Amino acid sequence: MCVRALCLSTVHVSDQSSKLTKLQTNVSASASLHISDQSSKLTKLQTNVSELRVAFSAGLTDSGSVGPFDKETTLIFSKIITNVGEAYNPTAGVFTAPVSGLYVFSFTAADYLKGYMGLYLYKNDKPIVFSLDLNDHGGYASTSNAVCLQLEEGDRVHLGLPASYRLYDDSRNFSVFSGFLLFHL
């Protein structure tokens, strides 16, 4: 009887050992899958964070006066101060949203001759903000404005100079256009 109990006990231990091995294999596989999933999520988050770095500032020109023109003209702020994410195109004067989000844009413009100076800020060719000044004293004057815009990926923002208006800029950056992503939506 003892021998039979010993045999049954050995079978039971062997069965338990087999079950334990299977359980360890399942736990190990599950842990590996979980770690792989977490690693994938971390990589995606790191990618998203790097995509969210968007900011630019650009001066208008070193050449002095810009305008007046016979018709409204898109201004090309070609003097890049900062262009993190390369979303501002200094050749076309247009910012293109690389991701959907809430963006902040600001601009300052100056002139020193008597007359009107001012700028429109456009989103997808629709005027959003206008800022102007009548420089009636003939010294340096400036105007500025800022706006928060909800943009979808691919939306475009630029500044336009109205017909018969003029601006001034030189190496001191009197006239500057800036924007940055506040947060991703």
Listing of model-derived features with the role each one plays in the protein:
Residues 64-67, 83, 113-118, 162-165:
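Extracellular, disulfide-bonded carbohydrate-recognition/adhesion ectodomains
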Residues 109-153, 169, 185:
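Terminal beta-strand-rich extracellular "head" domains
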Residues 83-120:
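Beta-rich globular "head" domains
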Residues 79-89, 133-140:
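Extracellular beta-rich ligand/substrate-recognition surface
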Residues 163-185:
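C-terminal helix/juxtamembrane-tail motif
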Residues 150-163:
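Noncatalytic modules at the cell exterior or secretory-pathway interfaces
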Residues 55, 116-118, 176:
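Exposed beta-strand and adjacent loop surfaces of beta-rich binding modules
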Residues 1-82, 86:
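Assembly "stalks" and propeptides
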